[in-house]
C-alpha cells in the first residue's frame, strides 16, 4: 500500500472507533455509524470506481439484534443487511455494532419500524440504498447451515507454502477451456486498522482457460498476513484473477466468520447477480 493510501486509512482509523475503547450508548444513536470510501482501495488494484464492468453486493448478517417493544419488553432478532457493491462507501464494522447496541434500550412499536429506521440510517451512511430484513427467531428456527460451499475443495491439495503476503504471480492457466466451481476455507487476512485476524471461505466460479489449482490455492493462502478489509480482499482476488487468468466470466464470493455478532459476505462478479438465494450460512458462521 502506497504512502498516500496509508495516510488516508490512518485518518480513517483516527476518526473512527476502530482499535479504541468505545463507550456504549444507552439509547438510539445513528451518529455512531461511520462510512469508509471504496474508491482509494479500488484505485490501488486498478478497478475503476465508476465502472459497471463488475457487479455484486455486500451482505451482512447480524445475530445480536434487540430492542424494547411498546411495553418495555425486550425483543431479540437477527438482521440481514445488503447493499450494492457500487455504493460510494462501506460501513465500518465496529461502528455498525455500536449502532445496533444503541437500539437495545430504545422502544419501537413494531418490527416494521425497526426495519425502516435501520434502512434509513444505513442508506444515509453509505450514500446508497440499503436493504434490511429483520427476522424474529421463530422465523429462522429451521435455517440450514451448510458444511461448505458447493464445488471442488482446493484445500485437499498437498502443497508447500512459504509466502504469506499477497502474491498474484502464483496464478496461471492452461490452454484447456473449462467451467469450474472451486472453493477454499483457508482464506485468512487481517483487519486493515486493528490487525485482528479475519477468517473466511471463498468460492470461485469461472469459465475460461483452466486455472492451475495449486497456484490458486497458494495465492489464496498468500493473503494470510495481508491487511485489508473483507470487501477489499474479495475485490483484490477478483481483480487479480481477471488480470492474470482472463476468464470469460468470473464470480468471487467470500463468507467470513463473525465478529461482534456480525459476519460480512461480499460477492463480485462479471455478471449481474441477484441477492436472492445467495445468503447461505456456512458451518463456521
Swiss-Prot record:
GO biological process, one term: queuosine biosynthetic process
GO molecular-function term, one example from the UniProt record: preQ1 synthase activity
Disulphide-bridged cysteine pairs: none
Keywords: Cytoplasm, NADP, Oxidoreductase, Queuosine biosynthesis
Keyword Ribosomal protein in record: no
UniProt catalytic activity: 7-aminomethyl-7-carbaguanine + 2 NADP(+) = 7-cyano-7-deazaguanine + 2 NADPH + 3 H(+)
Subcellular localization(s) per the UniProt record: Cytoplasm
A Pfam family of this chain: QueF_N
Amino-acid positions noted as binding substrate in the UniProt annotation, renumbered to this chain: 91-93, 230-231
Superkingdom classification of source: Bacteria
Active site (record annotation): 191 (thioimide intermediate), 198 (proton donor)
E.C. no: 1.7.1.13
Cited InterPro entries: GTP-CH-I_C/QueF, NADPH_dep_7-cyano-7-deazaG_red, QueF, QueF_N, QueF_type2
Primary enzyme class: oxidoreductase
UniProt xrefs under SUPFAM superfamilies: Tetrahydrobiopterin biosynthesis enzymes-like
Function: Catalyzes the NADPH-dependent reduction of 7-cyano-7-deazaguanine (preQ0) to 7-aminomethyl-7-deazaguanine (preQ1).
Family, as annotated: Belongs to the GTP cyclohydrolase I family. QueF type 2 subfamily.
Protein name: NADPH-dependent 7-cyano-7-deazaguanine reductase
Species for this entry: Legionella pneumophila (strain Paris)
Name of the gene: queF
Amino acid at each position: 500500500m502506497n504512502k498516500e493510501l496509508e495516510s488516508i486509512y490512518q485518518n480513517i482509523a483516527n476518526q473512527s472507533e476502530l482499535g479504541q475503547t468505545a463507550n456504549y450508548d444507552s439509547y438510539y444513536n445513528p451518529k455512531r455509524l461511520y462510512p469508509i470510501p471504496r474508491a482509494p482501495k479500488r484505485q490501488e488494484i486498478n478497478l475503476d470506481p465508476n465502472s459497471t464492468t463488475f457487479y455484486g453486493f455486500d451482505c451482512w448478517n447480524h445475530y445480536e439484534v434487540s430492542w424494547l417493544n411498546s411495553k418495555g419488553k425486550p425483543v431479540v432478532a437477527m438482521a440481514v443487511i445488503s447493499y450494492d457493491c457500487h455504493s460510494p462507501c462501506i460501513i465500518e464494522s465496529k461502528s455498525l455494532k455500536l449502532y445496533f447496541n444503541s437500539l437495545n434500550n430504545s422502544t419501537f412499536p413494531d418490527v416494521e419500524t425497526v426495519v425502516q429506521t435501520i434502512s434509513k440510517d444505513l442508506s444515509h451512511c453509505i450514500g446508497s440504498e440499503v436493504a434490511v430484513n429483520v427476522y424474529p427467531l421463530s422465523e429462522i428456527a429451521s435455517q440450514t447451515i451448510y458444511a461448505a460451499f458447493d464445488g471442488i475443495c482446493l484445500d485437499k491439495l498437498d502443497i508447500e507454502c512459504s509466502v504469506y503476503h499477497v502474491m498474484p504471480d502464483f496464478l496461471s492457466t492452461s490452454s484447456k477451456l473449462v467451467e469450474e466451481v472451486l472453493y477454499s476455507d483457508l482464506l485468512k487476512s487481517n483487519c486493515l486498522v486493528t490487525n485482528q485476524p479475519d477468517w473466511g471461505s471463498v468460492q470461485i466460479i469461472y469459465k475460461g482457460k483452466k486455472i492451475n489449482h495449486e497456484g490458486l490455492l497458494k495465492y489464496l493462502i498468500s493473503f494470510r498476513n495481508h491487511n485489508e478489509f473483507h470487501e477489499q480482499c474479495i475485490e483484490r482476488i477478483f481483480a487479480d484473477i481477471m488480470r492474470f487468468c482472463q476468464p470469460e466470466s468470473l464470480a468471487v464470493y467470500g463468507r467470513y466468520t463473525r465478529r461482534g455478532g456480525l459476519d460480512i459476505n461480499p460477492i463480485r462478479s462479471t455478471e449481474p447477480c441477484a441477492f436472492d438465494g445467495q445468503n447461505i450460512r456456512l458451518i463456521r458462521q
